């Protein structure tokens, strides 16, 4: 995804094992379509996890290569926060399938500065996921679909709604990265 003066230009491909071979051509395509060069960017944001080891390695390696070559700062963005960002809600319990009957989860509250973790991101058994007590919360993430038989009976009554289709998304990470750069969180 490309954040350009508040506008997002993005590509979405369900690539599976081919993600590493498609990522750089997609970046090139977005830059070309926007008539902007890599060195003209202010920085590069990437999905810093939690997530699959291979996916994180690809994200970090591509980001490091592009940033080093263009002398740009980078900022990592939480994949769980990107799920929360897609909901449009103010309080979100994000649950992402981690495989092997475990989940990555966190609880986020939106304030004037963006998202604040109420429960820090963690890897846990689905039985360990809890909804914070204060206010109205929604559930989001594919963990509610994959491990719904464990999560839904325990949590559904405490959540205003559940969207089990949401996954980490570059278009949702773009505004999060832009805000992080504005706060001076980029790393050279």
Segments predicted by a language model, with ranges:
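DPxDG-like acidic metal-binding loop motif
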Residues: 46-73
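Phosphate-handling active-site elements
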Residues: 33-39, 67-77
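Fold-independent oxyanion-binding glycine-rich loops
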Residues: 26-27, 34, 48-49, 56, ...
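N-terminal beta-alpha supersecondary unit
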Residues: 1-48
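Acyltransferase
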Residues: 160-188
């Amino acid at each position: 995804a490309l954040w350009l003066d508040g506008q997002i230009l993005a590509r979405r491909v369900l690539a599976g094992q081919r993600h590493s071979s498609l990522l750089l051509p997609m970046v090139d395509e977005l830059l070309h379509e926007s008539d902007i060069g890599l060195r003209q960017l202010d920085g590069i944001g990437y999905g810093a996890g939690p997530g699959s080891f291979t996916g994180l390695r690809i994200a970090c390696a591509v980001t490091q290569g592009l940033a080093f070559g263009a002398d740009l700062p980078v900022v990592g963005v939480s994949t769980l926060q990107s799920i929360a960002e897609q909901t449009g809600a103010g309080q979100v319990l994000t649950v992402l399938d981690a495989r092997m009957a475990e989940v990555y989860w966190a609880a986020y509250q939106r304030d004037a500065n963006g998202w604040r973790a109420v429960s820090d991101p963690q890897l846990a058994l689905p039985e360990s996921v809890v909804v914070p007590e204060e206010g109205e919360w929604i559930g989001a993430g594919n963990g509610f679909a994959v491990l719904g038989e464990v999560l839904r009976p325990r949590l559904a009554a405490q959540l205003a709604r559940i969207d089990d289709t949401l996954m980490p998304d570059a278009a949702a990470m773009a505004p999060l990265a832009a805000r992080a750069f504005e706060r001076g969180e980029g790393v050279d």
